[in-house]
Amino acid sequence: MSRWKIYTPDGVQDILFDECYKKREIEKRIRNTFRSYGYYEIETPTIEFFDVFSSEIEHFPQESMVKFFDQKGRILVLRPDITVPVARITATKNRDVQVPIKYSYIGNVFRFNEVGGGRQNEFTQAGVEMLGDSSSESDAEIIAMAINTLKSVGLKEFKIEIGQVEFFKGLAEEAGFSNEDIDAISKQIDKKDLVGVEEILNRYDISTELREIVLKLTGLFGSVDVIKEFKKASINGRSLKAIENVEEVVSILCDYGLSEYVSIDLGMLKSLNYDTGITFRGFTNGVGFPILSGARYDNLTSSFGKECPATGFSLRINMLMTAMEKAGHTFERPSVDSLVCYEKTNRKRAIEIAEALRKQDMKIETFVLTKGIDQAKKYAASKKIGGIIYIRDNDKITVYDIKNNITEETSFDTLLNNQ
């Protein structure tokens, strides 16, 4: 036998009964939340051309993508994300559809990640995208949906941190940072590295006030009062407009009754080339990584030949499952209701009974006896099946209530009429 035949590659896993039930239940609740807002589901191909993800606007290093060739020598990838294909669809197949266009999706994506911290090379991504609306209302709706999605699966203790990349871009413009330093300082701010930010600022002759504002981005975050603190400063029009956008979004979220879940972090600057306005991330207690993230990305569709404002969010189902486990939230897989067992001579009647009970919305397994009824009892106990229906002949049936240790004789008609 080949050495690797019994293993799975790094970063992928088998999902067995209990975990798979939990995953499907979470997906069902998420899907229902998306539909309740009018975001209907689409599917995109698992395999895409490499070019779809190779634009400067996207943020997927080519070494993180799973690449291979088709029969014509063209480079293909297993999709590392679903937002980008949604942008492709909008610019091509839905080019003339009335806006805003509201999409939802749940599907597997593939990236070479550092395995650990809940990260996998294959994981299920769920999300929504709204294209064609540049308003604060659309940003707030997306954030509200993110909050209500987490609530729908049972999470209670979490925060959505809201940022706005245009605030920093306005400061960088005023300071005259080079493109190289904009990239470097934004990374330091996002990591809350005060010393790293100071090292870059020391290379520029900027006002004391502007310097202090930039430094505050590494440490001033939390309640909505952060907005007021930054508004006191003398900032340019671009940064002021960004602050006002955040204010309006927070005000709308108050109207949704969701302000308790919101905090502010204007130093959230992970994807400056991709994000064009509001950004946000979701965190919960005991989990050191975001369980969801979202942003406005108005430039993405332009790489496919159409200008279209856009906003959305996505989450990783496996990370959400980890967060829920740490929060003590469980989904118990329901057991089979009854085991219908029989000798082969009574097979037809057993199948008839099993099918009739299934039509009554019961979960029924069948079991062929070869070593007597104790064989069925042992099997039922191992699978936590509460009852056994033993078909002795066409109209002689013994019912075993294993949980309450009760045995009774019954008939075909009585059995079906009592369920």
From Swiss-Prot:
InterPro entries: aa-tRNA-synth_II, aa-tRNA-synth_II/BPL/LPL, HisRS-like_core, HisRS/HisZ, HisZ. CDD domains: HisRS-like_core. GO terms for cellular component: cytoplasm. Its main location: cytoplasm. Pfam families: tRNA-synt_His. Pathway: Amino-acid biosynthesis; L-histidine biosynthesis; L-histidine from 5-phospho-alpha-D-ribose 1-diphosphate: step 1/9. GO terms for molecular function: catalytic activity, acting on a protein; histidine-tRNA ligase activity; transferase activity. It comes from the Bacteria. GO terms for biological process: histidyl-tRNA aminoacylation; L-histidine biosynthetic process. Keywords: Amino-acid biosynthesis, Cytoplasm, Histidine biosynthesis. Gene3D superfamilies: Bira Bifunctional Protein, Domain 2. Disulfide bonds: none annotated. The keyword Cytoplasm applies. It is found in: Cytoplasm. SUPFAM superfamilies: Class II aaRS and biotin synthetases. Required for the first step of histidine biosynthesis. May allow the feedback regulation of ATP phosphoribosyltransferase activity by histidine. Heteromultimer composed of HisG and HisZ subunits. Belongs to the class-II aminoacyl-tRNA synthetase family. HisZ subfamily. This function is generally fulfilled by the C-terminal part of HisG, which is missing in some bacteria such as this one. HAMAP family: HisZ. This is ATP phosphoribosyltransferase regulatory subunit.
